[in-house]
Amino acid sequence: MFDGIGFMELLLIGIVGLVVLGPERLPTAVRSVSSWIRAMKKMANSVKDELEQELKIEQLHSDLKNAESQGLKNLSPELQDSINQLKEAAQSVNRPYQVEDVPAAKDVPAKEMPTSETSTATNANSDKPNG
């Protein structure tokens, strides 16, 4: 815990603390300092553990990607075809829903479609007071 501090230094710190704080406040000061040290150690250990866990996850992820890329290259044609079919099925599920019954914009006659000129004119007329 105290790598660079020997017994004599600890004894000197204790005597100075006793003189400065007095016998009433010294035990509470020692408890609070030890709780701070404990909290800092706990925080440092949790950060270290979290970083190690993230590095392990990242390593596993990269290993999985490498194994997947090498494994897909060595597959038989039948397995490759089935994987392609599964990928196509997954893409079709991910596509947004498209309605086939609604006519496209090019099928609607021009007089039914509002143009930007008519909508601008309508907006300009709506700004004029009625009267």
From Swiss-Prot:
Regions of compositional bias (Polar residues) in chain numbering: 86-95
GO biological process: protein transport by the Tat complex
Residue ranges of the TM segments: 2-22
Skewed-composition ranges (Low complexity): 115-131
Function in brief: Part of the twin-arginine translocation (Tat) system that transports large folded proteins containing a characteristic twin-arginine motif in their signal peptide across membranes. Together with TatC, TatB is part of a receptor directly interacting with Tat signal peptides. TatB may form an oligomeric binding site that transiently accommodates folded Tat precursor proteins before their translocation.
Gene Ontology MF: a single term: protein transmembrane transporter activity
Protein name, entry field: Sec-independent protein translocase protein TatB
Taxonomic superkingdom: Bacteria
HAMAP family (UniProt xref): TatB (MF_00237)
Annotated Gene3D superfamilies: 1.20.5.3310
Region of interest: Disordered: 86-131
Pfam families: TatA_B_E
Keyword list, A-Z: Cell inner membrane, Cell membrane, Membrane, Protein transport, Translocation, Transmembrane, Transmembrane helix, Transport
Family of the protein in this entry: Belongs to the TatB family.
UniProt membrane topology term: Single-pass membrane protein
Subunit record text: The Tat system comprises two distinct complexes: a TatABC complex, containing multiple copies of TatA, TatB and TatC subunits, and a separate TatA complex, containing only TatA subunits. Substrates initially bind to the TatABC complex, which probably triggers association of the separate TatA complex to form the active translocon.
